[in-house]
From Swiss-Prot:
This is HPr kinase/phosphorylase. The keyword Kinase applies. Catalyzes the ATP- as well as the pyrophosphate-dependent phosphorylation of a specific serine residue in HPr, a phosphocarrier protein of the phosphoenolpyruvate-dependent sugar phosphotransferase system (PTS). HprK/P also catalyzes the pyrophosphate-producing, inorganic phosphate-dependent dephosphorylation (phosphorolysis) of seryl-phosphorylated HPr (P-Ser-HPr). One of its GO terms (molecular function) is ATP binding. Residues 209-218 are annotated as: Important for the catalytic mechanism of both phosphorylation and dephosphorylation. Mg(2+) binds at S168, E210. The Walker A ATP-binding motif also binds Pi and PPi. The active site is at H146, K167, D185 (proton acceptor), R250. It comes from Burkholderia cenocepacia (strain HI2424). Its EC number is 2.7.11.-, 2.7.4.-. Keywords: ATP-binding, Kinase, Magnesium, Metal-binding, Multifunctional enzyme, Nucleotide-binding, Serine/threonine-protein kinase, Transferase. It comes from the Bacteria.
Length: 322
């Protein structure tokens, strides 16, 4: 990932209001940030932000009341040595939290080395938690996919397929049935955790749905506030096809998945044909996926019944004609 745009200035601008940050000194170092190696070697955002640590270089160092108190109890020689080691690590910036006064020697060294120094009245723990969440978001893997992203029965569903198959019309039908629109045409996905991908709408396309013959529709204005969603976790991909290809299976023996940002996402394929109620089919696919997530697999249950019937043809099953 390109980390050139992530620097002290951008982080300060994005978090100044939330964390009540003040830029004390080191303004010349506004371009300081993380190296690509540092980000690549980090297993999580916890490796990029933390309490004062002289072992891990190139990380955001937060000095709370405990660190300042420890500093005050050191001898002048130890204070000078610790401050020199801290600045030598070349952190993107330093934060003095908890409303504590920044030590004069720290301010002086930050000024001389152009190391940004922020202060905040918030506790060190709160600052670290907030910055870790922020870093995990901006450094998370991202992708933009084409389709209509909807909230159907509380599940994030992406409608995909070739142009002209009626994805937007299907989305409009589902919205009229009480489901919610997240994004149309271009959907921004980001992997925020080890087991989920979140989808949002680009700001330019917020609340808009393009339908051929009608143009752009403002779904929020037409259907109301409850017809749109800010974000949803992607759980199912519904691919619309005009006609089955050679790989299309009417009764697939294994669940289909699509890799999205390194995670396997469940997928179903629905053929578009005259007379087919696609909205009902999509809702049924969503309900079936919900059952599968709960451990209920209808196809596997049927195969188990079939296997038992083949092993014992004379066995009695509910509903068997005799």
């Amino acid at each position: 990932m390109d980390t050139s745009s992530i620097n002290a200035q951008s982080i300060f601008d994005d978090n100044a209001a939330t964390l009540k940050l003040s830029w004390l000194t080191g303004h010349e170092g506004w371009e300081r940030g993380f190296s690509a190696d540092t980000v690549g070697n980090a297993t999580s955002s916890a490796d990029l932000v933390g309490h004062l640590n002289l072992i891990h270089p190139n990380r955001i160092q937060v000095l709370g009341e405990a660190e300042i108190d420890y500093y005050q109890r050191q001898t002048d020689e130890d204070r000078s040595r610790h401050m020199a080691e801290l600045i030598a690590l070349e952190p993107p910036f330093l934060v003095v939290a908890g409303g504590a006064a920044a030590p004069p020697e720290l301010v002086l060294r930050c000024t001389r080395s152009s190391t940004p120094l922020f202060t905040t009245p918030m506790s060190a723990a709160a600052v670290i938690d907030s910055l870790r969440l922020y870093m995990s978001r901006i450094l998370a893997p991202r992708a933009t996919l084409h389709g209509v992203f909807l909230d159907i029965l509380g599940m994030g569903v992406l409608l995909t397929g070739d142009s002209g198959l009626g994805k937007s019309e299907l989305g409009l039908e589902l919205i009229s049935r009480g489901h919610g629109l997240v994004a149309d045409d271009a959907v921004d996905f980001v992997r925020l955790g080890p087991d989920f991908v979140e989808g949002r709408c680009p700001p330019l396309l917020q609340n808009l749905l393009e339908v051929r013959g009608l143009g752009l529709l403002d779904i929020k204005t037409i259907f109301g506030e409850t017809a749109v969603r800010r974000k949803m976790k992607l759980k199912l991909i519904v691919q619309l096809v005009r006609r089955p290809d050679g790989e299309f299976q009417r009764l697939p023996l294994e669940s289909q998945t699509v890799d999205v940002l390194g995670l396997p996402i469940s997928k179903v394929t629905i053929q578009v044909a005259a007379g087919r109620n696609l909205a009902v089919l999509v809702e049924a696919a969503v309900r079936n996926t919900i059952l599968q997530l709960r451990g209920i697999d209808t196809l596997r249950d049927f195969m188990d019944r079939q296997r038992l019937a083949m092993q014992d043809p004379d066995s009695q099953f509910p509903g068997k004609l005799v």
